Amino acid sequence: MPERTRGFAHRIDVAIEPEYVWRALTTTASLRLWCSPAAEINPRPGGVFRANVDRITKLEAHIDVFVPERRLRLIYMPCPTLPSADSALVDDFIIEGADGMTILRLLGSGIPGDPAWDAPFMRLRVSWERAMTRLKDLLDGQRSKGASP
């Protein structure tokens, strides 16, 4: 029987154009402001994303989907500080803009339902929730200054 998996969803709404949200997701300097101080990205199809999501877990992902100002999907490589898994961990950032507003959704999936994953699941979910809040604050601040992230 296939392994049962779980996921999470986060959403922010910002009064800024999608291009600014995209830049915040795909430039190392911006990622370091809201995601992780050591974050790195090689923003292209097949590129790499690296970040410390918490003090324990350093993640590295392959950029599977790269559609400027629309979608960024990350497929994570196995991590030695996480329990083993038969499923791939995935984060899918989906950007939707209209009339000067942008909705950014983050859908995390593929996290094993095994009890060994309970604590890592909570750390990932909460860490991304906090990061998305920091991203919203960053983008709202940039909008009020009239500058890009």
Task: Give residue ranges: language-model regions.
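Short, hydrophobic/aromatic-enriched beta-strand segments in well-ordered soluble domains
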Residues: 12, 106-109
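Conserved catalytic core of Hanks-type protein kinase domains
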Residues: 24-25, 66
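Ser/Thr-centric signal marking residues that sit
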Residues: 26, 102
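A conserved amphipathic terminal alpha-helix motif
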Residues: 3, 110-149
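Short, flexible helix/strand-to-coil boundary loops that buttress conserved ligand/catalytic motifs
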Residues: 25, 35, 76, 139
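Hydrophobic-ligand binding "helix-grip"
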Residues: 39-40, 56-101, 109-110
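Short beta-edge strand/loop motif at the mouth of beta-sheet-based domains
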Residues: 9-10, 16, 20, 29-62, ...
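Short acidic N-proximal helix/loop "leader" segments that mark the beginning
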Residues: 1-9
